């Protein structure tokens, strides 16, 4: 899938002949685990910590050079085997072929005309690599004893993948041998390529991903060397950082949530064939059919014979695409930049603001987003900023006034300002905040554009610079939009324009990932998807936010690492037909502690 660079392709489990003392590596792994388990560094110290962790990782990689499992041939040499295997096991293989596209790498190309909403691809459960198949594999005994594997399905999948890759007779070998040998996720970035991301909003997630992956490797290296249930694993004599990085990258770029066989819970899966599809803007058109027990995908649009077949991965930002999928998507209509805001506890009105926010279902401190499209802020961020800028009298009105409930409902509705003065304040604040963020970058927009145009850069360096450029463009648009809104409301205030009446209002939608948690039906009418954003009122949003704990998470606000504890259940309605979010963005960045 996507544009994934490939140094050498893997085909059969052949270990290298190099030799290194397990005890020597174990000592380095212990040092790495200790370093990665230390408290988070203070402001401005993250880069220093990253370099230190990277240095330890490179020492381990150097010791392990030549020990990784390798495969012969090129990735594409084994596409025919994959198609044959898929066909023999009930998957659809007609109407498309796997080819290399100049810009996006390998993908699916239509060999016949395919109509929009036509079911063209299905993959039965038996072909999927899942947490359940991992528990029933050679990994099962260790899984039953290790709390990290039990709690984090993505790590379980990564080890499942490694164990099956090391077995030449694995059922999934036709699939595994077609996976890329390396990826363009930041785990593969050189230090100079990561340096291009310094001062960006995304860099913190890059650091976190690298640190947590290193911590996981160090933890599991010790487990594999010392745990009695790890003795029979094919990784016992060769579990390298290189292998683990490959496995977690394979999983983070491909994992998806599907229902378990009885439909009672969700689990993680790798889906052969389907994961070859590249991304474009659109709607999610993939779901899981419990009746036929298979993953199904309908066409996003009409595809003519010879055209590439695209799917929509979800409403991801480019930071999420780069960090979790290893590519940058130009003209991403869902791109956004994180912005962390909170009400200071030293604010004399903190208690009142906290109460109003609580009634609206908004935390006093949270990470919001500035969007590429207009308006640049979500209903939730608008509501937060309104409360943040309220006077004492305005807060009292929202807590004790005659229309207090209506006022809470309309906090996220742009048509019903709290007051003209409040609107001027919030847009002024947003303009100032976005302007300050712009000043933290070491280069400006024009310099980045010039650098991209005039330098011969690696794929990863290009992605990094495009990502920081995209952040600046979003922030600059936010500054301009905020300034325009500020002046508009200032004019309304100066002219003494009347405020809209609350009794004429409809509840405003407060976003917070709740919309994405609605479960569309497989093969649903795609036109209905456009109305989802309007379907939830604030009241529904708050109540559904609590219900999300028992449901399937779609979209960008998924559970960390795309997994949940095995005991969690789907409700009865969700069990009938569950749709997973295309290309879960989750990665293996959850903390692992010894």
UniProtKB/Swiss-Prot annotation:
Location of region: Disordered: 1-23, 553-594
Modification note: Phosphorylated by GSK3B, which is required for recognition by the SCF(FBXW7) complex and subsequent degradation.
One BP term from GO: regulation of uterine smooth muscle contraction
Catalytically driven reaction(s): L-histidyl-[protein] + S-adenosyl-L-methionine = N(tele)-methyl-L-histidyl-[protein] + S-adenosyl-L-homocysteine + H(+)
PROSITE patterns cross-referenced by the UniProt entry: SAM_MT85_SETD3, SET
Subcellular location field: Cytoplasm; Nucleus
Biased composition (Basic and acidic residues): 564-594
Domain SET: 94-314
Summary of subunit composition and partner proteins: Interacts with MYOD1.
Record gene name: SETD3
UniProt domain comment: The SET domain specifically recognizes and binds actin, suggesting that it does not accommodate substrates diverging from actin.
Family matches, as Gene3D superfamilies: Rubisco LSMT, substrate-binding domain, set domain protein methyltransferase, domain 1
Protein name according to UniProt: Actin-histidine N-methyltransferase
Chief localization: cytoplasm
A Pfam match: SET
Keywords from the named record: Actin-binding, Cytoplasm, Methyltransferase, Nucleus, Phosphoprotein, S-adenosyl-L-methionine, Transferase, Ubl conjugation
GO cellular component: cytoplasm; nucleus
Residues given in the record as S-adenosyl-L-methionine binding sites: 75, 104-106, 254, 275-279, 325-327
UniProt function note: Protein-histidine N-methyltransferase that specifically mediates 3-methylhistidine (tele-methylhistidine) methylation of actin at 'His-73'. Histidine methylation of actin is required for smooth muscle contraction of the laboring uterus during delivery. Does not have protein-lysine N-methyltransferase activity and probably only catalyzes histidine methylation of actin.
Entry GO MF terms: actin binding; histone H3K36 methyltransferase activity; protein-L-histidine N-tele-methyltransferase activity; transcription coactivator activity
Record field: compositional bias (Polar residues): 10-23
Top-level EC class as recorded in UniProt: transferase
Keyword presence, Chaperone: no
């Amino acid at each position: 899938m996507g544009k994934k660079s490939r140094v050498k392709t893997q085909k059969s489990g052949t270990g290298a002949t190099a030799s290194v003392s397990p005890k020597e590596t174990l000592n380095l792994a212990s040092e790495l685990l200790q370093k990665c388990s230390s408290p988070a560094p203070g402001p401005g110290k993250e880069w220093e910590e990253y370099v230190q962790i990277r240095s330890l990782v490179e020492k381990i990689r150097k010791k392990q050079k030549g020990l990784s499992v390798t495969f012969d041939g090129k990735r594409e040499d084994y596409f025919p085997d994959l198609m044959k295997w898929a066909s023999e096991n009930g998957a659809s293989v007609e109407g498309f072929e796997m080819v290399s596209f100049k810009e996006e790498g390998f993908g699916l190309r239509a060999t016949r005309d395919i109509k929009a909403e036509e079911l063209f691809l299905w993959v039965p459960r038996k072909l999927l690599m899942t947490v359940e198949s991992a528990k029933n594999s050679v990994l099962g005994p260790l899984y039953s004893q290790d709390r990290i594997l039990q709690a984090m399905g993505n790590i379980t999948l990564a080890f499942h993948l490694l164990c099956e890759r090391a077995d030449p007779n694995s059922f999934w070998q036709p699939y595994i041998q077609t996976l890329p040998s390396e990826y363009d996720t930041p785990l593969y970035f050189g230090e100079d390529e990561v340096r291009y991301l310094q001062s960006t909003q995304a860099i913190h997630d890059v650091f976190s991903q690298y640190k947590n992956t290193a911590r996981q490797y160090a933890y599991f290296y010790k487990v594999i060397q010392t745990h009695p249930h790890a003795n029979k694993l094919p990784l016992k004599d060769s579990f390298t950082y290189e292998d683990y990085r490959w496995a977690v990258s394979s999983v983070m770029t491909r994992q998806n949530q599907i229902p378990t066989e009885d439909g009672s819970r969700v689990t993680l899966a790798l889906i052969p064939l389907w994961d070859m599809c590249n991304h474009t803007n659109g709607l999610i058109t993939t779901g899981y059919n419990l009746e036929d027990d298979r993953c199904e995908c309908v066409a996003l649009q009409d595809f003519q014979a010879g055209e590439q077949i695209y799917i929509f991965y979800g409403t991801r930002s480019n930071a999420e695409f780069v960090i979790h999928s290893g590519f940058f998507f130009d003209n991403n209509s869902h791109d956004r930049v994180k912005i962390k805001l909170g009400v200071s506890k030293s604010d004399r009105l903190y208690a009142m603001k906290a109460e109003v926010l609580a009634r609206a279902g908004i935390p006093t401190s949270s990470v919001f987003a500035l969007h590429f499209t207009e308006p640049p802020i979500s209903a939730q961020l608008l509501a937060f900023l309104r409360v943040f800028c309220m006077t004492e009298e305005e807060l009292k009105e929202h807590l004790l006034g005659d229309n207090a409930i209506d006022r809470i409902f309309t906090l996220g509705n742009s048509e019903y300002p709290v007051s003209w003065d409040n609107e001027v304040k919030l847009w002024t604040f947003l303009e100032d905040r976005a302007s300050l963020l712009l000043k933290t970058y070491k280069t400006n927009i024009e310099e980045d554009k010039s650098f991209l145009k005039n330098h011969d850069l690696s794929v990863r360096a290009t992605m990094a610079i495009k990502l920081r450029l995209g952040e600046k463009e979003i922030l600059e648009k936010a500054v301009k939009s905020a300034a325009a809104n500020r002046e508009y409301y200032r004019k309304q205030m100066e002219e003494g324009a009347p405020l809209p009446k609350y009794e004429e209002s409809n509840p405003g939608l407060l976003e917070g990932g709740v919309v994405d948690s609605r479960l569309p039906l497989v093969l649903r009418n795609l036109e209905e998807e456009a109305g989802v954003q309007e379907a939830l009122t604030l009241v529904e949003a708050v109540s559904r936010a609590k219900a999300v704990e028992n449901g399937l998470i779609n979209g960008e606000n998924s559970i960390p690492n795309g997994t949940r504890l095995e005991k969690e259940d789907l409700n009865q309605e969700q069990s009938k037909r569950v749709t997973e979010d295309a290309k879960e963005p989750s990665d293996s960045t959850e903390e692992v502690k010894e």
